[in-house]
């Protein structure tokens, strides 16, 4: 079955989601000014042929480092506007990111089982 859901695609998507929630929403940076995909949509899963494992992991690490810098300037209950949700606080964003990453760790677990039969016993 053709799919963009790959181990590396999951990491690439996670980086885009970090950028979207922390840099765009909390940091207030326009998406077009963010270095890398900041939408979390289908293109965020697509790892181009020129990208390497180390490069995609470095992108995720970089996005997380910027996220930590931005979050350091907020209290947990400090809220910012969101175009669909009204207001979101840092606490809400953290909880959303935990859910988002947990869901995709589950996807990675299923992919791993398909690759080599390893299960998370």
Question: Where are the model-predicted features located?
Answer:
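Short, contiguous alpha-helical
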Residues: 1-43, 82-121
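Acidic/histidine-rich alpha-helical segments that form the ligand environment
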Residues: 42-81, 91-97
């Amino acid at each position: 079955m053709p799919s963009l859901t790959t181990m590396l695609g999951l990491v690439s998507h996670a980086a885009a989601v970090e950028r979207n929630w922390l840099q765009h929403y909390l940091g207030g940076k326009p998406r077009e000014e963010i270095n890398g995909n900041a939408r979390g949509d289908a293109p965020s899963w697509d790892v181009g042929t020129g990208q390497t494992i180390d490069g995609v992991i470095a992108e995720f690490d970089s996005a997380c480092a910027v996220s930590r810098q931005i979050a350091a300037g907020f209290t947990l209950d400090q809220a910012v506007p969101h175009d669909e949700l009204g207001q979101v606080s840092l606490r809400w964003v953290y909880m959303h990111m935990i859910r988002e990453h947990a869901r995709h760790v589950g996807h990675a677990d299923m992919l791993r089982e398909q690759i080599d039969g390893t299960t998370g016993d």
